[in-house]
Amino acid sequence: IWWNGCKPVFVDIDPATGNIDPDKIEAAITPRTTAIMPVHVYGKPCDTKRIQEIADKYGLKVIYDAAHAFGVEVNGESVLTAGDMSTLSFHATKVYNTLEGGALVMHDAETKKRVDYLKNFGFAGETEDTIIFL
């Protein structure tokens, strides 16, 4: 986050769940806020409905850290369907691991296209540059 010139603002947790406390999110939002980045801690899903309501109210993206939430569902749906994106880690300390690595689950084609370019050093194919000076 810092590397990209952004400044994280931390929001306290709900002591009962260990997850971000939705009641405290709005107080942390400023005109510079662009996203809410909650973590599903130890397989306990965040209150995705309330977080999305807050994000919609302020026009913010929601990017979940779902590294602990493989297979976790809320109302019969995977937590990976919540928000604009979910991130997964395959580090050795996670439930499913490859020693290192991860995955992104996105819900819109434009974001996926941009991420695909970034992961391939800005190339769309063998010769087409899409992001100059990456």
Language-model regions, residue ranges each:
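PLP-dependent aminotransferase-like
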Residues: 1-66, 73
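Active-site nucleotide-sugar/metal-binding loop of Leloir-type enzymes
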Residues: 28-30, 78-82
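Active-site region of PLP-dependent enzymes
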Residues: 69-75, 82-134
